[in-house]
Amino acid sequence: EHTELYFSSNDALDVIPRLPDLYDEPFADSSQIPTFLVSQMAKQHVTVALSGDGGDELFGGYNRYFWGKKIWNKLSWMPWSLRRLLGAFILSQPVERWDLLSNYACKLFSSAGVVQLGDKAHKLGARLETVHNIDDLYMSLISQWGKPQPVVNCNYTARTILDCREAWPNIDSDEERMMYLDSMTYLPDDILCKVDRAAMGVSLETRVPFLNHRVVEYAWQLPLSMKIKNGQGKWLLRQLLYKHVPKALIERPKQGFSIPLAEWLRGPLRDWAEALLNEQRLKQEGYFDPEPILYKWNEHLAGRGNWQHHLWSVLMFQAWLEKQNNKQ
């Protein structure tokens, strides 16, 4: 039985005040909102649910695994100084201008165009200015604020395996190195945390079959060609699904679990966000330098950039801090 849940920005606004208590830390993956709402819906029918988390990391499902190397192969021939100039030019053009270009090309060539071309162009422009190798590209793909020093008023930065490249395993395959690092960081620190705390917030237990140790061991024994083939991830899982599920339900673009956060921050969530990002408040609390944050906030409001993820990280810290201060 297939069930769909539709929710609005008002539903999100109802959930947001609960997030600091649900996560008990400044957790900043905006898909935490739909995760909580779908858990709430599932709890009406079951007490235990199965989750497919881990499938992407083990069987090569994320776009970065099969696009990362292609992007780097196209960029690596270009001298860094030229990449930097190209990146600066791309960033100098407003998001709306790139979107208009996409719409014009769509009409001119009778094609589908590129969805959110402006956002994608700005992300590419930022990476052109900073990446020197494929590992740099990977770090840029998984990071929001690339370096915390200009934003956070603190001399100490917590180090993880991502900051210690000398500790990275000697894996020849760029794709499998990304999969390993995601399995060690993104999966436990983001995905599993997000799902477990959102689900337990409504007393729904979740089980993760892909993370059975036998499945993990088996997946890492498989050659990469059984995971990524013809520019498509999770090849082996697809072959199994073809036996049980119509192909039309499988061969679709990866959708993720995102919400229209960029639009909502300019609209129904704006007042909530502006109260948390108040310049005097940021200065008084002393955790952040207001200048780079407010610069991105104003850029976002004006439509000159899509900084939803950068801003959400700060907003979730601010919301958590407000909750802690109110408890005292």
Describe the role of every protein-language-model region.
Residues 159-173, 220, 286-305, 324:
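Short amphipathic alpha-helical segments and their helix-coil junctions
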Residues 65, 161-167, 194-200, 214-222, ...:
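Short acidic (Asp/Glu) and glycine-rich catalytic loops that position anionic groups and cofactors
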Residues 145-180:
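Glycine/proline-rich, flexible active-site/cofactor-binding loop segments
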Residues 245-300, 304:
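PAPS-dependent sulfotransferase catalytic core
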Residues 1-154, 174, 198-244, 270, ...:
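ATP-dependent adenylate-handling active sites, centered on carboxylate activation for C-N bond formation
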Residues 184:
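Basic, amphipathic alpha-helical recognition segments used for DNA target recognition
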Residues 187:
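Globin-like tetrapyrrole-binding proteins
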